[in-house]
C-alpha cells in the first residue's frame, strides 16, 4: 500500500470550497479532466471522468461527512496500473476567507509503478487545489 497526501491553504472560504468539491460534479472545471458525468448524489454516487486522451476513470463516492467537511471516494476502474485506490478530501476553515484543503489517497500497485503513480497523484492534487482556488476567486 502506498500513500500520497497534499495539503494546501487557499484564499477562499471553506463553505465555497466544500460546496464545489463535495457535489462530486463538474470536476473538469478545476482539473485536467476533460469531461465528467455523475449519476446520483451523496454516498453511492457514481462519476465517470474522461481524460484528454479519452481514457475513462470510474469512481464511487463512498462517504460524505458534511459536519467534518470530508468525503471519501474510490476508483473502481481506470487506466492506471493500480489494483486499489481510495481517496479522502478534507476541507478546513483557517479563517473566514482562507481554507486548508487536504487531498490524499492510499493505493496498491506493482512495486515498479509505485513511484510513478505517487508522482502522478501528487501532481494531480496540486493542480486541482490550485485550480479550485482560481475558479472560486473569479
Which ranges hold each PLM region?
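A conserved amphipathic terminal alpha-helix motif
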Residues: 100, 106-138
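Catalytic cores of transferase enzymes with a strong primary signal for eukaryotic protein kinases
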Residues: 3, 49, 113
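Short N-terminal helix-initiation segments at or just after the protein's N-terminus
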Residues: 31-51, 123-126
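Hydrophobic ligand-binding cavity/cleft-lining segments
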Residues: 1-42
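Hydrophobic-ligand binding "helix-grip"
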Residues: 29, 38, 52-98, 106-109, ...
